[in-house]
């Protein structure tokens, strides 16, 4: 295995989904403009200044748009849960040269994807004209339900015990 000794910056936040409270750690890619200095009494929330960085190939056909929207959905979920407000995507060509940069506000991504007019025509990723938009709120509700199930079903009497959950996509089809 290759070791990465590059320093990483992480943040830890307390959040909740439904009645479940979570403490989540996340790597932060960069700070947009400045990082408030909490040691000096700055009361501003540092999360407001954090940014997630992504790269993507230039979108030049329906399948690449479909792949990008799925990537943006996964990035949205990560940033939404932690509270990172901005995502910056660099679009590169086939020679890995950066050609354009787009900024996205995390909270606006569900509407952006839902209102994508290209999604509603017959060319969206080769799935026969079926509108295939990521389900943002159902995904969060599923996570909340799953965490509630875990909370109810995993015994809390032995904190040293590890649990392994498995999902078999072959037996758990829609």
Summary of predicted features, one role per range:
Residues 1-174:
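Accessory terminal regions of nucleic-acid processing enzymes
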């Amino acid at each position: 295995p290759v070791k990465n000794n590059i320093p990483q910056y992480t943040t830890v936040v307390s959040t909740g989904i439904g009645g479940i409270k979570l403490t989540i750690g996340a790597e932060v890619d960069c700070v947009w403009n400045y990082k408030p200095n909490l040691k000096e009494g700055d009361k501003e929330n540092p999360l407001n200044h954090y940014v997630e960085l992504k790269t993507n190939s230039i979108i030049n056909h329906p399948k690449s748009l479909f792949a990008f929207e799925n990537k943006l959905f996964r990035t949205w979920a990560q940033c939404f849960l932690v509270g990172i407000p901005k995502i910056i995507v660099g679009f590169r060509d086939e020679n890995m040269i950066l050609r354009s940069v787009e900024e996205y506000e995390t909270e606006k991504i569900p509407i952006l994807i839902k209102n994508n007019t290209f999604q509603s025509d017959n060319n969206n990723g080769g799935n026969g004209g079926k509108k295939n938009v990521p389900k943002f709120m159902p995904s969060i509700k599923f996570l909340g339900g799953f965490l509630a199930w875990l909370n109810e079903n995993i015994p809390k009497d032995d904190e040293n015990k590890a649990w392994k959950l498995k999902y078999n996509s072959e037996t758990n089809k829609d």
